[in-house]
Amino acid sequence: MKKELKDLNKHGFNSIQAAEIKAYQELIDAQQALHANPRDERLATVEKEASNQYKQKQEIYVQFLKQKAKCHWLKEGDSNTKLFYRSIKQRRLRNNIYAIRDMTGVLKDSPGDIAEAFQQYYAQLLGTSMQDREKVQSSNLEAGPLLNDDQRQKLLGDPTVEEVKAAMFSIKGDKSPGLDGFGSFFFQDNWDIVGKEVYKAVSSFFNSGKILKELNTTFLTLIPKVNCPRDVSEFRPIACCNTVYKCITKILCSRLKNILPDIIAENQGAFVHGRFIVHNIMVCQDLVRRYGRKNTGPSCMIKLDLRKAYDTVKWDFVREMLLGLNFPHQFTEWVMECISTPMFSLILNGTPHGFFKSKRGLRQGDPLSPLIFVLCMEYLLRTMRKMTEDKQFKFHPRCKAMALTHLCFADDLILCCKGEPYSIQEILNNFHHFSKVAGLTANNSKTKVYSCGMKEEVINNIIEQSGFKKGSLPFKYLGVPICSKRISVSQCEKLIEQMTARISTWSSKNLSFAGRSQLINSVLLSIHQYWAQVFVLPVSVLRNIEQICRAFLWSGVWYSTAPGYISWENVCKEKKVGGLGYRDIQKWNIATMARHVWAVANKQDNLWVKWIHSVYIKKGDWWGYEPPKDGSWYWRKVCETKRVLIHAGLKDTLLNMRRFSVKAIYQQLITNQEKVFWASNIWSRYNVPKHSFCLWLAVQQRLPTADRLTKWGAQMQTTCGLCGTGQESSEHLFFQCPFSREVLEDLKSWLNSRNTQQNIQGICKWINRRSKQAKVERAAWNLALSAATYHIWQNKNAVQHGKPKQGREHVVAQVKFQICQRLQLINVTKLSSREKNLIDCLNSS
């Protein structure tokens, strides 16, 4: 198919931007000809064809730019071509490598030398095998469950057509493609054509156990791990795997993920269904509650940083683990064929370099790698579990009941024990055994030892023997600070920095109000959401977050103190009650923390809940429980959240929840507010988002018209710039100004309407009364109202800034075009013949 697809790209999708510009010009010419001869049916047909061609070319062009820009937060809205161009430029500047130090520290600054430095580094990193590797000890594996016959059977068998299709459609279409350049969108959109061939290719692998080498040839793209990388080691290699290969490994993953919860220990929190990252964080938070205090028992915790974890896993170790856990031989061979046969090329500054084979490692970017890595880390846990049979080994305080010796989330590893030499040495000895078996070693410069109640001499001996560094609290674990005292404002600075840094990467010139609004909802508040699942954040931090979001929405920067057009309290209301649908982050914080209250009440089967019942509640009643004074600060905050929820009358709600819903709790925490009748008109799914935002301000009379600006102290001309007669106000601009009246009258005539309302709210009421059953009519009127409001406002602003005023015909033509364009989003198969005729009439008139 490669030749045919290349021809399609050359003749069908070449010069995408030029084709879009040409189609737009042809549409303008056709519309001008039709305007001069409105009764000419041939010109009407030509205009309709030109309109369809332009829509098609524009959609292709926008999708092309969006894929290059990698704006994953932007799901819908305007074409945003300026934003995409800027994002593409920023990505190139950020990802291009102009100079780098090689493995020996020599600076390389020519393209050829840079490529050679990276090839040598990764050929050595991935192409080096371990000569004196120890083998997996079966006695250690027996310290945990092995696969039974039913589980083994679930892993085997040829995939069905439905299984292959489900695997392909589970791959996100906007992910970077592999060496062949075909992303999953191609296969999904053309499944009726290529589905059988994909199924044959996938089935061939499961039947033969061999994979075509072309399917397992991989691009490695290098992602910087630091802001300004200087050495070849400061990059993370991400594999861009072939899409058909991903389909194969997705099938293996779908079978394997159902087995993992039964064989992976509960203190491994990553990539196992039903386990969450916050569980490890919260247990760790409780472990350090006495660190930093005087007169406390000896405790030791080691935060291990694994050096190049995924890249150094030994393949022999993977095979021994799978077979040792009683995985079927055939399944083991499928996995080994996938991970041990890839060939690599490096992508540097957009160009492929080199072609080499690896001898170890799991590819980051391969769907199978995380699950295999979890199985590898299971050996460490079982080794540690075997170690605890030694009666001389002493657990970390509070850990004996659960036999807890470490916490693991992927390659983030914490080891803990009592702060005495023998126990610490046993922990280190068993980790060194794991290193010799798996190939995973500690990065001594980044591994930290934390302690309390220990003699300085003992600590220094451990540091000297291990080569690790001495650490102090607070420290960062899984993205958040771990501290023995209540989290402070200064410890939340990282959260604020993440938000402001993200805003700084965007240009407000390329983002409309609607674009900023979507960025706040999709990105900024999501950054806060992760922290809000773990901590009850300080009120001052939450207020700071609100200030940042408010400044960005109204000013496009994070540091502005200028007032907004609408109060933040009203902005954070739901759309149906007149707001923008942002969350009240203080109440959202309570709602997210309510998950832990619910989990404890329902005794959920996870590590943290077991820890809480073991250490604190024991056999007591949770709803009547009060935390001890010496309990950790975070546990007291969880109990405080419980009291808030009880006071809000949500105890019964939590008890009756079979599955926890943050949204349901949040809905009950926010005050009941009266719905506004105009919300459905403004936020119609067919409206252009930036038009909706403008109309949202206009319907509340919050647009910065001259009369409002002068009240705020602005010195300016108050005469309407569109007519030059009346005083500019919201009422005058949209309904009393002769220019605006003519625009609205033309649209009324075009839509065959007799509406006589003279304000936006009145028109909304009229639309809602007239078109409850007529979907197309309602959508057309909502589109007309929002588009007319937007273009009149933009025209006024253009005149105010010295630009020429657009004529009435031009504004009306723009509104009509956008109405017809957006009506194409309606599924015509579900429309009545009358509504189909209405769309045809609007397109042809």
Residue ranges and their predicted role:
Residues A69-S233, C247, P481-I482, T671-Q673:
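Surface-exposed loop/turn segments and immediately adjacent short secondary-structure elements
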Residues R708-S845:
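Family-specific functional microsites
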Residues K2, N9, S233-I264, M282, ...:
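Conserved pre-motif C helix in the palm subdomain of viral-like polymerases
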Residues G581, K637, T641-Q727, H791, ...:
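Helix/loop segments that flank and initiate small ligand/metal-binding modules
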